[in-house]
Amino acid sequence: MNPKKNNNTFLSYFVCLFLLLEVGLGQNQISEIKVGVVLDLNTTFSKICLTSINLALSDFYKDHPNYRTRLALHVRDSMKDTVQASAAALDLIQNEQVSAIIGPIDSMQAKFMIKLANKTQVPTISFSATSPLLTSIKSDYFVRGTIDDSYQVKAIAAIFESFGWRSVVAIYVDNELGEGIMPYLFDALQDVQVDRSVIPSEANDDQILKELYKLMTRQTRVFVVHMASRLASRIFEKATEIGMMEEGYVWLMTNGMTHMMRHIHHGRSLNTIDGVLGVRSHVPKSKGLEDFRLRWKRNFKKENPWLRDDLSIFGLWAYDSTTALAMAVEKTNISSFPYNNASGSSNNMTDLGTLHVSRYGPSLLEALSEIRFNGLAGRFNLIDRQLESPKFEIINFVGNEERIVGFWTPSNGLVNVNSNKTTSFTGERFGPLIWPGKSTIVPKGWEIPTNGKKIKVGVPVKKGFFNFVEVITDPITNITTPKGYAIDIFEAALKKLPYSVIPQYYRFESPDDDYDDLVYKVDNGTLDAVVGDVTITAYRSLYADFTLPYTESGVSMMVPVRDNENKNTWVFLKPWGLDLWVTTACFFVLIGFVVWLFEHRVNTDFRGPPHHQIGTSFWFSFSTMVFAHREKVVSNLARFVVVVWCFVVLVLTQSYTANLTSFLTVQRFQPAAINVKDLIKNGDYVGYQHGAFVKDFLIKEGFNVSKLKPFGSSEECHALLSNGSISAAFDEVAYLRAILSQYCSKYAIVEPTFKTAGFGFAFPRNSPLTGDVSKAILNVTQGDEMQHIENKWFMKQNDCPDPKTALSSNRLSLRSFWGLFLIAGIASFLALLIFVFLFLYENRHTLCDDSEDSIWRKLTSLFRNFDEKDIKSHTFKSSAVHHVSSPMTQYIPSPSTLQIAPRPHSPSQDRAFELRRVSFTPNEERLTTQTIHFEDEESDIECVVEQ
């Protein structure tokens, strides 16, 4: 064998083996990726989370040993300082060139780090910064691996809706953590009055007590607390000391506090939060979670042997966030040199002018956004770079227990703890709900302020109308004592309440008598109520809630009255309007014609010369007005029409008489003006009460501002009206009635009345006193006490006639009676149709004759038939008998009577005559008839012989 050849072969094998080893080593090479961690290392909270982060990496790479990347943690201490946290992040980016940052702990530290991450394109994932304010900072490189605080506000709103609480005080800390949730909470609780109570983040015990004592003086007893858990724990301790954890109070904690409250107490009793409700995100139970808790506890004890604490939800979020970051890094395949070189160089780690930009930041962010897995805290699914909204648990702290009393989900809302059906806490639930003070009764959410606190009631100072409200202030004691109609009703209503309310009155003076500023004081908390002649308006209701009105509502017009005794010459025409007069006259003519039509052939009263028939018809029709007609109606159709018409006439005459009486008596004193449009058209001056909303109302109605004159009292109004300065005074009905109680014979209230809401008492929005006082006002106004109060302040008014007694032009019009005329018209029309049908049927041979006569001749013949007597009518047959004298009379008739009568016209114009002979005997009346016909070309004579 050739030694040289063997050496070459050996060398070739060696080279191949070397290359294979290089390839294998290259394939198994592990890349170390630097990741920064910014925590407050001296806090237990950060130690808990750091243990979870280390365990997350250990578990992840233990489960995936073949992954080519490994996260190398570079931990920095933020020292509970925002500036230090930003400096730590800058150091990690500039000097360590980390690919991502985990942290910081709170939202305040995250605010600057987000901007830094956006500038350097380094993804920053936080598992504990929950403030919604961070979402408003425009940055694509901030990832929230925790729950946004705004997610829970709908669950809180559902609790309020379930219990019906109408007001709440939001107690929050004055930083990004507390302020971030407030806009969302206010929006969710739109139907609830939300007040604020801000606690400084570094508040001492005295500051906390001062704020709590201030809250005790309010009516609201429902509090929502949102702040760091340690500060909240101190607030609950002080609230317990001063008695704010007793029966009647409601305390509700937000998500982060509910999760952390047990950790803050470090195993101590939870008595300071006994009966408190809490909202927290739901963590599904799993075998993996229980296993992790055991391993976490062992590791935490090794790393921190002097601490005793439990795993919190934030530790779980830290674990899941770290796991998600490791998965995204592996998916991105980041190299060891992740940064592009910045222009310039500097050795200063805080030099902002030479910031490096991560090459793999966009890819890592995209990979992180696509990560989906079931984590220890629940489903890890990022939507817009933050965790999706989870299910929330409703927790009730009872002793040392945390009872789950319900759930809330985005899709189903509140869900009973024992079922999947939507429900409320007032229905079936898992165990009783315990409230502060060990009470099982749902608090109503408000109480009258304790410790003898009085409600501050504002009372307006008026220049007139003192019977409504008058304020008297003692110059020595400076004690304000109001009196008047409004004050008496208010105090009577307070006595009807099931609890004691002590009003403390404060006078309010306004140069322009405008009550809007007084209502504003209720809105800003200066006053607890406003009592007086305050009109309820839509604008004022934006700033306060009003009770039910305690006076008659409406704006009306008051004018002087004048005696019209000498101006009533034509007063008899006033009860009816022109349309009613014309319609009635037309119907009189119509009814007269219809009755004549029905009676002409069968009733001798309606026969004779034309002028006699016309006179009889009109006489009969108009005489029905006084039921004085003496003509007998024999036709059934005419009787039907007359009966209907008599009913119409009866109603018309009675209405006319009643209205005429009103015009001759009540309306003898007529108002000087009765129409608003006439006042505007004539340019008359009108008055209004100074400072009242009526001025704006009059301008809206069309009055010129220059034509408006104010008055401040009933005396001023009387002076303006009496001397002619104004033609009318506009004000609310209650004021006008007060004026009439003094001058009832001189003025009158004229319709129409424009609707308003009336006078009411103002309370803060959503105040529970509003509804209770409204109910009390109803009790007062419906009882005898109201009459006593009215007599006390408006005694003379009872002696005046009703000021609204039809002083407007109340003529009766056709609109009031068109139904009657419709009935009469239909009755006449139907009767006329029946008559025409019967007449045409009887004379059908005239119309249907086959002769060559023209239509006109046939109609003429038909008219002649109508004009003749209907011999077949029973009226004429009976008249022939009754015209003969009775046998008991002394009159002896002639032996016989011969009557020749023409028969109805035949189509051939033949004539027939009836010959009658009537004979009598002393003892009986006997009538015989014999018909004899004489026929020729000219006539056909019928001879009737009566024997």
Curated annotation (Swiss-Prot):
UniProt topology in membrane: Multi-pass membrane protein
Molecular function, one GO term: ligand-gated monoatomic ion channel activity
GO BP, one annotated term: calcium ion transport
Glycosylation sites: N42, N118, N333, N341, N348, N420, N478, N524, N659, N704, N723, N779
Tissue: Expressed predominantly in leaves.
Disulfide pattern: none
Phosphoprotein recorded as keyword: no
Cross-referenced PANTHER family: OS06G0188250 PROTEIN, OS09G0428600 PROTEIN
Function field: Glutamate-gated receptor that probably acts as a non-selective cation channel. May be involved in light-signal transduction and calcium homeostasis via the regulation of calcium influx into cells.
Name of this chain's protein: Glutamate receptor 2.8
Organism for this UniProt entry: Arabidopsis thaliana (Mouse-ear cress)
